[in-house]
Amino acid sequence: MSWQNNLHSVSPYIAGEQPELTDMIKLNTNENPYQPSLQVQKVIEDFKSENLRLYPSTDAKFLRKALAEYHHLNTDQVFIGNGSDEVLSLSFLTFFNGQRAILMPDISYSFYPIYCELYRIPYQKIPLADDFSLSVNSYFQENGGIVIANPNAPTGMAISLQEIEEILQNNQDSIVLIDEAYIDFGGESCLPLLEKFDNLVVVQTFSKSRSLAGIRLGIAFGSAEAIAHLYDVKNSFNSYPIDSLAQKIGEASFTDETYFQKSVSKIITTRENFKNELIKLGFQVTDSKTNFVFVHHPKIDATTLFKVLYEAKIIVRHWNQARISDWLRITIGTDREMNTVIQFLKEYLKNKEKSY
């Protein structure tokens, strides 16, 4: 028998393009357009390379303590992983045993079903409404767990804290995992609900609002028992997943709250201005609470618009996927970058009108 017959085949996640050209306006992977805080830069400058000969802390205890204090939690309620993708992967493996289907929106982060296929976890996609809103009542059914990105990606839309609490109250025998990768851009975090629900696990990241996508740091918050189980699984794979420099950078990123709030506020302001300009141009735009917008134009095919923008050295994100194939996701960059996009779209639409 050929060894290929024993392979476990999955369709891997396809990440956004990282173009080699440096003159592109890169708006396809939701990176923060602003640099990390000066505190982070100082840690990098002061880091002694001789320390790299030593293994890092196995549980990132100082970073966990800093996060616990920031969010008014106990240290044993905090888990640190190598990016939120690893945290999500380990969470699926830890909390969803595969006996019953887990529930997730049909339009959401495309890594979720891949984890299910990889770990042989049955899952059921719950359709969003035509306007991409989520009905909490759809999650009041038997399940092996629930996974919801809030705010959602790629739609950018958020559900309220009250709606999350309703889901938790009606699913107290299942883990409810809320992925808050974009929470700092306008959503309402459900971390306060950890006091009431031991079946809640909240995942966040340093990549977006903290401008640290390059160092790969992710977080899970939950009950002490849930986090202990998560560490048991993590340590069964790798007891040293977070390097020493990343741990120090993570700590430093939470010491400059003024810079953090200023950076996030700038992105939100730019997003709202960009949304308004798109609407003036005839685009349909969802009510984004993230650092991106999800857009559709009734007169322009999204595939065509994606290619036209790319040729103009503006790279955005498009999925050839049911229900959203005629939509584009556009990361919020600097004011200058977004103004460039608007001016290009104005010119493109004007020329298109002339050709009719």
Curated annotation (Swiss-Prot):
Keywords: Amino-acid biosynthesis, Aminotransferase, Histidine biosynthesis, Pyridoxal phosphate, Transferase. Its cofactor is pyridoxal 5'-phosphate. Pathway: Amino-acid biosynthesis; L-histidine biosynthesis; L-histidine from 5-phospho-alpha-D-ribose 1-diphosphate: step 7/9. The keyword Amino-acid biosynthesis applies. GO terms for molecular function: histidinol-phosphate transaminase activity; pyridoxal phosphate binding. PROSITE patterns: AA_TRANSFER_CLASS_2. It catalyses: L-histidinol phosphate + 2-oxoglutarate = 3-(imidazol-4-yl)-2-oxopropyl phosphate + L-glutamate. It holds the Pfam family Aminotran_1_2. Its EC number is 2.6.1.9. InterPro entries: Aminotrans_II_pyridoxalP_BS (IPR001917), Aminotransferase_I/II_large (IPR004839), HisP_aminotrans (IPR005861), HistidinolP_aminotransfase (IPR050106), PyrdxlP-dep_Trfase (IPR015424), PyrdxlP-dep_Trfase_major (IPR015421), PyrdxlP-dep_Trfase_small (IPR015422). The modification N6-(pyridoxal phosphate)lysine is found at residue 208. Belongs to the class-II pyridoxal-phosphate-dependent aminotransferase family. Histidinol-phosphate aminotransferase subfamily. HAMAP family: HisC_aminotrans_2 (MF_01023). This is Histidinol-phosphate aminotransferase. It comes from Lactococcus lactis subsp. cremoris (strain SK11). The gene is hisC.
